[in-house]
Curated annotation (Swiss-Prot):
Coiled coil region boundaries: 424-458
Region Disordered, residue ranges: 369-400, 552-594
Zinc finger (RING-type): 25-64
Gene: RNF207
Protein name: RING finger protein 207
Length: 594
């Protein structure tokens, strides 16, 4: 069964309305019929609880507390107190039969009916005047019908004697015969009904005061919790608004920096693309010129005789030398890598918003939250993904933050005379003094608390006033030291900024060195590929020369065995001898190497 019977409280004023009538069942909303009391002190009608028992337990429909039930009925015991209140209430008045006229009185007559305690009979208003008019009935005790249960002495069901005593030990009423049956020790706990009534009223008053105090504390707790619920809602709204505002600001900053970075990348791309295309166009016009001169050289060697060779050969050699010695931009003037340092740029644009310095993982705000006792914001640090372009570089690994004492000792052990080291020395002295005073106060307060709780010793007010005064003075000293340390932030921030710029410059130079070495490696691989492509043609020309001029066989063998020598000679501007040999085939041309 659901326990949602009462509506949620809307405010402190709804507490009284939510309590309901004490004689009305909260389930059926009618007057109790055989009210049953649960262990949680909630009452319900026996009919309302019937059928709710499971495994010998019944769950309270209001608070869901489990109550163990015993007996074949499967119901909790009847609440005798609440049943008495129900029977004594106005709604529980039974039909009245007058002892004189034996007629049922109407509801209006029942309200004016009386009861003669002396006769022990109910009387209607008319019969009371008729039967008790004589002087002999003047001493009869006549009360209202509703007061009869309070004033009439009840009788013992065992001995049919009126109750005269009350046992404070067994909490039971006793007649004279019950009193005689008790032992001597038990009789000492028996008092008359009037005294027992007075004592019971006093104890009941004390219990009522305790319940009222608990009621007042409960109302205050409810008011406090309702205020905290409102405060939590308001705090959640403020936090959500701050998150949205920060997120929007971060998006705006990132979008602006993204546009600038993309613009810078596009500018670098256009610049490098234009430079490479211009150089490629120059080399594209140079390659046919070289091809033509090689064909001219081969044709000249095959067609010219010795006289023609000596007449025009040196002119051809000068032309070839001029072609080779002209400045040609064979090496790329720029690298093909476009670097925008986007990670550092994004971090730099987010630094003012997130209060994260480039040299510290968490800012001063996180430390302040930790000192204040708050949980502080939890920063989710994920593994940094390496850039697909910058494969050589790696993200710096964040070292775990050392405790303050250990890190300070390590810093002071280095022996460097820096402003921060001098500040740490001064801070350690001040901190140890403040820590010693706090520990002294703590020990003194703990000792006083132990004397007060365990030994119940009397503590003078002067001692407490002195401790309070020392605590306030120590608090002022801590505030002063905190302000002094906080005032050094600007000085150290400038020093840290200079160090960071120096480290950033060193990192940039280091990355440039790696890029230069990588570029040299690429150029060397390109030259190796070109050499492998030229080697077969060098060997072919050497074999042709060997067949035409046997005297050049030795030199041709040397050149075929060492093709790298011919390649180096061509790089130095010297014409290999194999290219000047007559009979070279014009079709033996080196491939186009791009």
């Amino acid at each position: 069964m659901s326990g949602a019977i009462f509506a949620p409280l809307e405010g402190p004023g709804a507490l009284d309305a939510a309590s309901g009538h004490p004689l009305v069942c909260p389930l059926c909303h009618a007057q109790y019929e055989r009210p049953c009391l649960l262990d949680c002190f909630h009452d319900f009608c026996a009919g309302c609880l019937r059928g709710r028992t499971a495994d010998g337990r019944v769950a309270c429909p209001l608070c869901q507390h489990q109550t163990v039930v015993k007996g074949p009925s499967g119901l909790p015991p009847v609440d005798r107190l609440l049943q008495f209140l129900v029977d004594s209430s106005g709604d529980g008045v039974e039909a009245v039969h007058c002892a004189n006229c034996d007629l049922d009185c109407s509801k209006q007559d029942a309200e004016t009916a009386c009861f003669c305690n002396t006769c022990g009979q109910p009387l209607c208003a008319r019969c009371r005047d008729e039967t008790h008019r004589a002087r002999m009935f003047a001493r009869h005790d006549i009360v209202a019908l509703g007061q009869r249960s309070r004033d009439v002495l009840q009788k013992c069901p065992l001995h049919a004697e009126p109750y005269l005593m009350f046992s404070t030990d067994k909490k039971s009423l006793l007649c004279i015969r019950c009193f005689r049956d008790l032992q001597g020790e038990s009789r000492a706990h028996c008092v008359d009904l009037e005294s027992a009534y007075v004592q019971g009223c006093e104890r009941l008053e004390q219990a009522v005061l305790a319940v009222k105090a608990l009621q007042a504390a409960t109302r205050e707790a409810i008011a406090l919790l309702q205020a905290m619920v409102e405060e939590v809602r308001r705090s959640a709204e403020e936090e959500a608004a701050a998150i949205h505002a920060l997120f929007d600001s971060v998006q705006e900053k990132l979008a602006e920096r993204k546009a600038l970075l993309l613009q810078a990348v596009q500018s670098q791309y256009e610049e490098k693309d234009q430079a490479f295309k211009e150089q490629l166009s120059h080399l594209a016009t140079l390659l046919p010129t070289l091809q033509i001169h090689l064909v001219i050289c081969s044709s000249f060697l095959s067609l010219a005789n010795k006289a023609e060779f000596l007449d025009l050969g040196y002119e051809l050699m000068e032309r070839l030398q001029g072609v080779v010695t002209r400045p040609h931009r064979l090496r790329p003037a720029q690298s093909s890598k476009i670097a925008s340092d986007y990670r550092a740029e994004f971090a730099r644009c987010l630094e003012p918003l997130l209060l994260l310095g480039p040299r510290r993982a968490t800012g001063a705000q996180g430390g302040a939250n930790t000192l204040a006792g708050g949980s502080g914001p939890k920063v989710l640090m994920g593994p940094s993904c390496p850039s697909p372009v910058r494969k050589v570089s790696r993200s710096p690994v964040q070292k775990p933050t050392l405790p303050r004492s250990i890190s300070t000792k390590v810093l002071l052990a280095d022996g460097e005379d820096t402003p921060f080291a001098e500040h740490c020395r001064h801070y350690e002295d001040s901190y140890r003094g403040l820590q010693a005073e706090v520990q002294n106060l703590k020990d003194q307060v703990q000792e006083l608390h132990r004397d007060l709780t365990k030994h119940h010793s009397l503590i003078r007010a002067e001692i407490m006033a002195d401790i309070l005064h020392r605590s306030l003075r120590l608090d002022a000293q801590i505030d002063s030291e905190y302000a002094s340390v906080e005032g050094m932030r600007a000085v150290f921030q400038e020093i840290w900024e200079e160090s960071y710029q120096r480290l950033a410059g060193e990192q940039e130079i280091y990355e440039a060195q790696l890029r230069d070495l990588f570029q040299l490696k690429q150029e060397n691989a390109h030259l190796t590929t070109i050499t492998k492509h030229i080697t077969p043609y060098v060997r072919s020309i050497a074999k042709v020369k060997e067949r035409l001029e046997p005297r050049f066989q030795a030199s041709a063998d040397d050149e075929s065995e060492n093709p790298q020598t011919a390649y180096d000679a061509s790089r130095n501007g010297e014409t290999p001898a194999s290219l000047l040999l007559p009979g070279s085939v014009a079709s033996a041309e080196p491939p186009f190497v791009n």
